[in-house]
Swiss-Prot record:
Organism: Aromatoleum aromaticum (strain DSM 19018 / LMG 30748 / EbN1)
Family stated for the protein in its record: Belongs to the peptidase T1B family. HslV subfamily.
Example of a GO biological process term: proteolysis involved in protein catabolic process
Active-site residue numbers: T7
Binding site for Na(+): G162, C165, T168
The protein, known as: ATP-dependent protease subunit HslV
Keyword Protease attached: yes
SUPFAM superfamilies cross-referenced by the UniProt entry: N-terminal nucleophile aminohydrolases (Ntn hydrolases) (SSF56235)
Subunit structure: A double ring-shaped homohexamer of HslV is capped on each side by a ring-shaped HslU homohexamer. The assembly of the HslU/HslV complex is dependent on binding of ATP.
HAMAP family: HslV
A GO term for molecular function: threonine-type endopeptidase activity
Cysteine pairings via disulfide bonds: none
Described purpose of this protein according to its UniProt entry: Protease subunit of a proteasome-like degradation complex believed to be a general protein degrading machinery.
Length: 179
């Protein structure tokens, strides 16, 4: 059976201000199933932002596991991500999950990959999903050449990705944290 997939998730930071946004499209094969899905949300008492790309059910499983790690490690994003990655590599069920998480707090921006890797991308930009490369390119240009706040960069970059990627739409959810 085909999985629900296709999205763009983007996080941009300037200093300790970080925005994380995503589009709302969910597809099953070549059919749009939902246009207003919420794939980005604040977690851990609103102090951390998280977004997912990949299989929806798989992503919710990862969200739950990551939130449990955050509780265990008092909201330490990096430690929680590393501990989740360790579980991911050793747990048979987790290894079968087809999803990625983008997480950010005022100090860290991370990608937790489907291989159980934890990556801290350069330049404060995290982009995952089918439209991630388009959004990342736009965000990098805007971050380097304008004084726009992170949420505006995320908004404009998601719009560009939605114009180019057939699995990304123009229904956006953008969350912001101020450090």
């Amino acid at each position: 059976m085909e999985q629900y997939h296709g999205t763009t998730i983007l996080s941009v930071r300037r200093g300790r201000r970080v925005a994380l946004g995503g589009d709302g499209q969910v597809t099953l094969g070549n059919v749009v199933i939902k246009a207003t899905a919420r794939k980005v949300r604040p977690i851990y008492q609103g102090r951390i932002l998280a977004g997912f790309a990949g299989g929806t059910a798989d992503a919710f499983t990862l969200f739950e596991r990551f939130e449990a790690k955050l509780e265990k490690h008092q909201g330490n994003v990096l430690r929680s991500a590393v501990e989740l990655a360790k579980d991911w590599r050793t747990d048979r069920m987790l290894r079968r999950l087809e999803a990625m998480l983008a997480v950010a707090d005022p100090d860290n921006s991370l990608v937790i990959t489907g291989n159980g890797d934890v990556l801290e991308p350069e330049q404060g930009i995290v982009a995952i999903g089918s439209g991630g490369a388009y959004a990342q390119s736009a965000a990098r240009a805007l971050l380097e050449n304008t004084a726009l706040p992170p949420e505006e960069i995320v908004k404009k970059s998601l719009q560009i990705a939605g114009d180019l990627c057939i699995y990304t739409n123009q229904s956006h959810v953008i969350e912001v944290l101020e450090g």
